[in-house]
Amino acid sequence: MARILITSAIPYINGIKHLGNLVGSQLPADLYARYQRGRGNEVMFLCATDEHGTPAELAAAKAGKPVAEYCAEMHGVQADIARRFGLSFDHFGRSSSAQNHKLTQHFAGKLAENDLIREVSERQVYSNADGRFLPDRYIEGTCPNCGYDKARGDQCENCTKQLDPTDLIEPRSAISGSTDLEVRETKHLYLRQSALKDQLDAWIDSKADWPVLTTSIAKKWLHDGDGLQDRGITRDLDWGIPVKKGEQDWPGMEGKVFYVWFDAPIEYIACAGEWAEAHGKSDAEWERWWRTDKGADDVRYVQFMGKDNVPFHTLSFPATLIGSGEPWKMVDHLKSFNYLNYDGGQFSTSQGRGVFMDQALEILPADYWRWWLLSHAPENSDSEFTWENFQASVNKDLADVLGNFVSRITKFCRSKFGEEVPEGGAYGPQEEALIAELTTRLRAYEGHMEAMEVRKSAQELRAIWAAGNEYLQSAAPWTLFKTDPVQAAAQVRLGLNLIRLYAVLSAPFIPAASARMLEAMQTSDDNWPVDIATALNALAPGHAFTVPEVLFAKISDEDREGWQQRFAGVRS
């Protein structure tokens, strides 16, 4: 049994996430976690809310609440929506946890011991109107790289270029909108990433199986222009993890906090500590996932994220782990995604554009969204959500192919043999051909899932569903029943066993529908098939079943048009 550690990029606390966020990290991570559990492996799937930094402070101010209260409330909201989307986290933590405070300060202390942190006097934007320094996202302006007029002081969400606030053209305060800004001197700590450049370069070179998207972004930041730059890891903010050198105060850093992008990845580790505490387990139980000197040497660690998060996860976070000089588990595979666009433009949390997770669940159950998003995952290039494509995919794949198969075979069996698996007859050449095809397709499906090729996995699963429909069309048990009811019984028996097989194979994509199929077949046998022929005899003659309600309802043109109109603007 393999041990698989999975982390999804942790979502900002500042509101409910849109479908683009979901498909870029949490959803494919859940797909992989469910698949690995289904194969009998030991999985630790961790995620959390990212609660520090400017987004949290600004969102709390807008909501008229203290930031700690706002974060606690929104963590509950995000956890509930994640549960309703079927995201099977082993723990959904908080970057504001006591565990993350302690670990972040610990790493800073170790980096300082190893001469990998330097103190820098720098000039920073100060807002006279707001009476404070304006780091990062407190400043908006025009991106000097692409001209986007709503770029933030840390990164342009349009072109993904990392920025410093002083890089922005026509900067303004994100708090008050004031342009009465000036530059003043302040002191901050910098992580000396440049000192680790060669180690990071060699480490990335060793990851031959990483997606091109991941390695190309990492290499760009390592080698383009002046190469890998040192990164500021402190900020002048009220909310965050206080700057300390381990458990000791850090002279000159009073009143400052660690930069959100320093503490957020450390929360992956801290989250495991939160999990252990929540389940009454010892530290050894979480350390066996994260410390290679305490049992994590046999763990395979996989990360999922959007491409804008890649520089931090391939450079800054690894620099923190390597620079600590301690035996922490490093990522083995980093699966990154391009952007999902929305109807000709971008999804945007800050702009309220697109469909958000809570709104999606008001319209349709989670499995509809899970299937479309995963089958259209933006792996090799950006992809686009359109309502026409969503309707066509749901109606064809889920309703016509899978749902229709389940409905036809269960209803036919009930009408001719009753609600139990019929006996009699034997599998012949048609059935053997289907078994051979499904055997080949199952191995291909497993290969794509192991390689985290999300779209190809969805295509292969759909082909497995379609093979059942094609078999039914060809075998036509409803016709054969008139002349050879015994052999028709064998065909129906195979069809009912296919439903159980489909439930097991489909569970990573559409877990709720999978559970309904198993329930209809009145079985809890969800063992992954080793051999297709054996799997298609799992439900023996005489085994009772029920005809399920419609698995997936078709989306009407009227509904599609209504949703298209409803989500044409921005979220208020």
UniProtKB/Swiss-Prot annotation:
Matching Pfam families: Anticodon_3, tRNA-synt_1g
Protein localization: Cytoplasm
Coiled coil region boundaries: none
Chain residues that bind Zn(2+): 143, 146, 156, 159
Residues that hold ATP according to the record: 349
Motif extent ('HIGH' region): 11-21
Gene3D superfamilies, A to Z: HUPs, Isoleucyl-tRNA Synthetase, Domain 1, Methionyl-tRNA synthetase, Zn-domain
Any GO MF annotation of the entry: ATP binding
Short sequence motif named 'KMSKS' region, residue ranges: 346-350
Reactions that this protein is recorded to catalyse: tRNA(Met) + L-methionine + ATP = L-methionyl-tRNA(Met) + AMP + diphosphate
Cofactor: Zn(2+)
This protein's GO CC annotations: aminoacyl-tRNA synthetase multienzyme complex; cytosol
PANTHER family registered for this protein in UniProt: METHIONINE--TRNA LIGASE, METHIONINE--TRNA LIGASE, CYTOPLASMIC
Family listed: Belongs to the class-I aminoacyl-tRNA synthetase family. MetG type 1 subfamily.
NCBIfam families xrefs: metG
Protein name: Methionine--tRNA ligase
The organism of origin for this protein: Ruegeria pomeroyi (strain ATCC 700808 / DSM 15171 / DSS-3) (Silicibacter pomeroyi)
